[in-house]
Amino acid sequence: MTKSIIREIGPLALNFQDDKVLIFFGDNAPSELREYSIIHDVEVFNQNDFSAGAKLVIGKYVYEIEAVGGEAANNMSKLGHLVVYFTEVPDEILPGAVYAAPHIFPIVSNGEEVLITL
């Protein structure tokens, strides 16, 4: 299981609702990206969780991971960085991306858990 807690929601982090994208970063997010990011504390990390078929839970929203870019687990491990797309999986998967279904943009709040588990 991979588990994190949402600590801060950048003032522009939810501006990607129409694109159905959430950007997560650890507390070390670069200042130029922090306002666009959801800052979270990764409490537990398991690289094996980052695979198609895993479950992603954000607060009360439950998703199935449909595809994972080759760098997503590494980015999460080192930077707490994860980009989640609630869209169809494209032909070319972005290296740091996770694609989740259903394609519904979640409402997120400070203090909520983010879980990824097989």
Question: Where is each model-derived feature located?
Answer:
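Helix-rich interaction surfaces within compact, conserved domain-sized segments
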Residues: F24-F25, E88-L118
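Short, conserved beta-turn/loop elements at beta-strand boundaries and strand-helix junctions
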Residues: Y61-V62, V68-N74
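Short, well-ordered loop/turn sites that connect or cap secondary structure elements
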Residues: N48-S51, L56-V57, V108
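Short, conserved secondary-structure segments in the cores of folded domains
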Residues: N46, A52, A72, P102-I104
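N-terminal disorder-to-order initiation segments that are Gly/Lys/Arg-biased
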Residues: M1-S37, E112-E113, L118
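Short, solvent-exposed secondary-structure boundary/capping segments
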Residues: A72-V83
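Conserved "cap/hinge" positions at secondary-structure junctions
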Residues: G59-K60, L118
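Short, structured beta-strand/loop micro-motifs enriched in basic residues and often containing a Trp
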Residues: L33-F45, D91-A100
